[in-house]
Amino acid sequence: MASVAMVVSNACSPDPRVMRSARLLASSGHQVTVHAFDRQQGSPMSEIIDGVRVMRYHIGTHTYGSQISTLLGLRAFAKTVKKTLLTNPPDCVYCHDADTLSIGVELKKKVGLPLVFDMHDLQHTWLVMGHPGSILRAFLARRVEKRNLKNIRKADLVVTSSGAIDNGVHAGFREYLQPHGIEAMVVENRPNRCDDHQKQNETKEDWTVGYLGRVREIEPFQLLTQAIEHLPVESRPSIKIAGDGTSVDAVHEHLLSEAPRLGVDLNMSLAFDTDGFSELINDVDVMYAMYNPNRGNIRQGALPVKMFDAASFGVPTLVNSDCLMGEVCKNEHLGGVAQWGNVESIASELLAQREKTVTLLNFGTKQQETFIEAFEHLL
């Protein structure tokens, strides 16, 4: 049994990707502690979840996003975690996403710890979000990307959350890394079973479109309300949104303005845990998971966790076409696809998925077994 220190730059309350990888290692007999950065200091500093200890660092309140205060907060978190782990080194350090990778690199250098890097996202793309024309931000993003790739090469095992499917045409994060001389294994962020509660394939007078997850941009919700407006009044769905994030206030303000104008009911709430997801999705008929493709991580293979989680409850998801998430969605019959910006297509596809049910058949078991084998070989 090995002691594993996982590091993540959010409060892990919850972070499905982090907790699934932690549970996987714990179920194989390893002792896992998640070192999480609770920027808003709103979660317990220490708790045990499914045999995994989550240790949250409260070092003052800090923002999310790409602001200077965010970077200062991350530096303070990294400094504190390094001190903690150097005082009592684990057998392995496991870094989730590039904003924690410097911690693992330093621990590997100073103590010789094996380093696992799990890439769920392309960190440098966040710098240009909302500022696609900024020359300065583009320059900074390239600098960050170069630094991240240099650090990733120092990892002993690299895991990504997406990769091209067999006979597919769209690349994933694994393929993004390959031209840079980095080999990675894919472990997609899938639930390990279908829930007992499944959406029923039946005609209902009222129906609901839901978005359950991080709220990072307003554009998808502007597009959603435009699509709903395109539907006949009697066919318009209620809207349910749950989750926190950098744009949650702006999105709430937008929906509070648009819902009365469209004549639809609105249900809004903030962060939720795994049990909360089960409750929230009970009345959702279609999950909405569309994103601006100008975000680099969308074009380069991001797969929305909510698509797999919704499917485990029988709920279809609407995602972007012309990228990996759309290809996976169609290949596994998990919902519908529409082109970003095509309001008519989005409206039509939402309506088409209204009474459908889906079945998640792939739980990523083979990927997980391959990962455990590689992890234990590393140790």
Cite the ranges covered by each PLM segment.
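Short hydrophobic beta-strand element within catalytic cores of glycosyltransferases
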Residues: 286-289, 309-319
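N-terminal subdomain of nucleotide-sugar transferases
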Residues: 1-42, 46, 157, 163, ...
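Membrane-proximal helix-turn-helix segments that form the acceptor-binding/catalytic region
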Residues: 79-86, 102, 106-110, 117, ...
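A charged, aromatic-enriched C-terminal amphipathic alpha-helix characteristic of glycosyltransferases
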Residues: 340-347, 352-379
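Glycosyltransferase donor-sugar binding loop
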Residues: 212, 238-252
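Nucleotide-activated donor-binding/catalytic signature segment of Leloir-type glycosyltransferases, i.e.
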Residues: 252-281, 286
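A short, active-site helix/loop in glycosyltransferases that binds the activated sugar's phosphate group
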Residues: 141-184, 191-193
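Conserved donor-binding/catalytic core segment of Leloir-type glycosyltransferases
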Residues: 159, 191-193, 200-229, 240, ...
